[in-house]
Swiss-Prot record:
UniProt entry tagged with the keyword Signal: yes
Main location: secreted
Gene that specifies this protein: IGKV1D-43
Entry's localization field: Secreted; Cell membrane
Record domain Ig-like: where: 23-117
Protein name in UniProt: Immunoglobulin kappa variable 1D-43
Domain of life: Eukaryota
GO CC terms of this entry: extracellular region; immunoglobulin complex; plasma membrane
Ranges where the record places region Complementarity-determining-1: 46-56
Region forming the signal peptide: 1-22
Span list, region Framework-2: 57-71
Keywords in alphabetical order: Adaptive immunity, Cell membrane, Disulfide bond, Immunity, Immunoglobulin, Immunoglobulin domain, Membrane, Secreted, Signal
Species assigned in the record: Homo sapiens
Length: 117
């Protein structure tokens, strides 16, 4: 099983914006949410076609570079707290934060790396 970590390069930022020209379209929901410390939070991401679990989740805080949190749909990047988990296969993927902490308030992005533009 190939569990490649996605390349972290500027070009991949194109995949995070609506209207980017690529073969696979990613849709994330909800666009925004209100949550409190201790809440269980779930974010869902759908691919327009199967991506064989080549799905990464990133966390970004204001004025900071995005950080890879999860790769290959469910593999936690080193140093990421265990309250974060990823799941899914085929076209449907989920990021879950089991108990939201103050440092978790941020923007989260999904990104497929099954194919590139």
């Amino acid at each position: 099983m190939d569990m490649r970590v996605p390349a972290q390069r500027l070009g991949l930022l194109l995949l995070w914006f609506p209207g980017a020209r690529c073969a696979i379209r990613m849709t994330q929901s909800p666009f925004s949410l209100s949550a409190s410390v201790g809440d269980r939070v779930t974010i869902t991401c759908w691919a327009s076609q199967g991506i064989s679990s080549y799905l990464a989740w990133y966390q970004q805080k204001p004025a900071k570079a995005p950080k890879l949190f999860i790769y290959y749909a469910s593999s936690l990047q080193s140093g990421v707290p265990s309250r974060f988990s990823g799941s899914g296969s085929g076209t449907d993927y989920t990021l879950t934060i089991s108990s939201l902490q103050p440092e978790d308030f941020a923007t989260y992005y999904c990104q497929q790396y099954y194919s590139t533009p």
